[in-house]
C-alpha cells in the first residue's frame, strides 16, 4: 500500500472571497490528492472549530495561516509514512494529535483538508474514481437535489426569516432532473423580473427578492413550476430550510416578516399549515437546536408525512445524532463534512443514520469552492439527496457537473429514486 510521502497546506479563497484551507497529500508512488474546505454562514453552536487567525491586518481577521502552519509543521510530520489507504488511522492520528473535543488546537479546517486530500490521493493511487474508492461497487445512486433558489435569513438582505426555499426535481434520471430544475430556475427569474423584484443572486446562487411574508416565496415557486410546464408536487416538489436557531430568542420564534412571536407549538402549527397548502417534502431546522422538546413534538406531528432534517441540532456529530435517534428527534440528518472535521467521522455519522432508518442529505456550505468532493461522497454512501445550491455560480454548478459525469460513467447501473427518497 502506498505510504504518505509529504503533506502541504496553503491559504486559498472560497466563493465569498474569504480565506480557506487547501491541502495536498503526496504518496510514494507519485499519486497526489488535493482538497479545499468550505465555510458556513449560519453555524451550529456545537460544530467543530474553524481556526481563523483573528489578525485584523489580514483579511479582516479571517486569515487561516495558523491552520496552514499546523498542516505544514505539525500534521505532516505525524502522517509521513502512514498508509494512505488506511483512512481511519490517518484521521485518528490527527484527531489524537489535536486532543480537543472540537478540534480547536489544530483547527477542523486543517484536519479536514488533509483528511479529504488523503482519500483523493488513495483513489488516485488505485486508479479508481473517488466515489468508487469510498463506496465500492454498491456506490451507484445519484442524489435527488434540493436546490436553494430563493434566499432569506442570514443568506439575504430581505425581510424573510426562513433561510432557504428549495425546489426538488423528480424526473427519472439525475440529468433530466437537472434540466427540469434549470427550466424552473429561469422561469422564476422571469417572474421575479415581471414583478419588479431583484434578480441578483446570493452566496448560494439563489435569488433574494424583497418579499414581505415567509409564505410568499412558496407561492411564487409554485407559479414558476407551473409556468415552466411542470406539475407541483408530482414533477417538482418544494423544501424549506428555516435555520430556526437564528430567530429563536428566549424560548420564542421571532418571525419579523409576520410581526409575530411564536411558541414551539405555534411554530409547529405554522409549519403544518404550510405543508397542507404547498407540496413540501422536506423541512430542515424547522425548530431551534436548543428546542429539543419542540423537536420531539414536531417529529411526532409531521414526521410521518414529511422529511424533517436536523442540521444545527446534530452538526454531523455521531454522538449527538445517536442521542437524537434515541429521543425520536427528526427523521433525517444534514451531513456537512466541515461540521465534524474528518472523513472518518462523517462516514460514521452516515452509517449511524442509515442503520436507524434516518435519511441523509449531503450538503455544501454557503462559502464554497470548486472542490467537488461532496458530489462523489453523496454517490459513495447512496445518500439519495444532496444540497449544493442553486443553478448559478460555478462553485455550485461544479458539483452538479460532477454528478452528471458520475451518472454517465455508471451507465445502466446508475439509480435515481426521485420522490422515493422522501416517502415516509
Swiss-Prot record:
Localisation: Cytoplasm; Secreted; Cell surface
Q: What class of enzyme is it?
A: lyase
Output the InterPro entries linked to this UniProt entry. Enolase (IPR000941), Enolase-like_C_sf (IPR036849), Enolase-like_N (IPR029017), Enolase_C (IPR020810), Enolase_CS (IPR020809), Enolase_N (IPR020811)
UniProt keywords (A-Z) are:
Cytoplasm, Glycolysis, Lyase, Magnesium, Metal-binding, Secreted
The prosthetic group or cofactor this protein requires is: Mg(2+)
Q: Which organism is it from?
A: Dictyoglomus thermophilum (strain ATCC 35947 / DSM 3960 / H-6-12)
Q: What is this protein called?
A: Enolase
Q: Name one GO cellular component term.
A: cell surface
